[in-house]
Each structure stands twice: as C-alpha cells, then as structure tokens.
Amino acid sequence: MQDVERLINEPVGCPGALNTFWHGELGDAWTAPRFVPYHDGEVPDDACGRQVNDPRQFADNALYCTLDDTVAYSVDFLDELAQVGGPTYPLFVLMHELSHRGDRIGGNLGVVTRAEENQADCFAGRQASAAHDAGRIAVRDALQGALLFYSLGDTRGGWFAQEPASAPDAHGSPRQRAQAFALGYLRDSSTCHTIGRSETGDVSF
C-alpha cells in the first residue's frame, strides 16, 4: 500500500508516478493534484462538499470536483476496495478521477457523460500501463483493473438501458468499463480520446 501512495504523490520525474504520466500528456499545464479524504457520513472539505452538504451523496464514492480542482475520496470506500482486490483497487479509482482532471486541463472532455466516464476508465488503463512499464506494479495487478471496473459498471436494475448516455450520472456498463480500461492499458491515449468522442458512449473498435 505504501508504494501505491508513493505512486499517487511522487513528483514529476519519478518513474511510473501518476504526476510523471500526466506531465508527459499535458506538460507544465499539469500540476500536483490536491486530494481531500473524508469518511462516510461526512462531506468532503472542498467546494463540492460545501455546495451539496449531504453526506449521502458522497458515501462510498470518489470524485473530481471541478469547482476547486480537487480529488475527494471516501477513505471507507477505498478501504473496502483494498480488502476485496488489494491496494491497486483504490489506486485505479484514483487514476479514474485524475483522468477527469487531466481531461479538463487538456480540454478533451467526452461528448456525453457516459463517453467521458469511459474515457476516464481508458486513461486509468494508460496510467496503469505506465506504472507497470516502470516496474511499479505487476502485470497481474494491472490487469485486475479490468475486473474492478467491470464490478463498478452500471447495472442497477436496468438503469443502463433506461437512461441516455447524456444522463448526469451515466457511466459505462460493466463490459464497457472493463473494455475501456483494457484498451487504455494495451493501446495509446488517442484510443481514449476516440472513446470520449462516442455520442452513444459505446466502446467498440
């Protein structure tokens, strides 16, 4: 778990670090992110928490807050993920949220909500690939990301089929999320941008 924390916090130039990856994508436009941990039953101490002020909206969650450029996460949620899949599971969730930050800094937003979420899953795969190439995480752990995002895909009693790709909370289906992560891991950033341009939120090549 300590190496996972180092991957998140190490400065630009450290092999496999997430800041190194994003600096390679965005140059000096990328700055070290600010993380805001909180517990279920609380609201994060950031602009999104102050605006909503309803702990239920933040339970078992992690999010990038565009209002003040922060990444907030429930410590309880990430601890639960670590118990299920080991320390890389929470790492992949934070990679996903950092992808939203990178997309906004780079001006590469998805055309609809579901496409934007799938694009973030894809860039989580890109970051996992960079960390593996630097010898920071094992290939087995990296590919576990596809299983994680499959488990986090939208099912919710047919919700995926009932809501349009532009719905505010739309994410990819289990298959789409796993496929997006795997494509990011195996291919390149242009693949992720292609996913972000899908008006239906589909992930197919």
Residue ranges and their predicted role:
Residues 75-92, 109-114:
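Short pre-active-site segment immediately N-terminal to the catalytic Zn-binding motif
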Residues 98-114, 126-133:
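Catalytic Zn2+-binding segment of zinc metalloproteases
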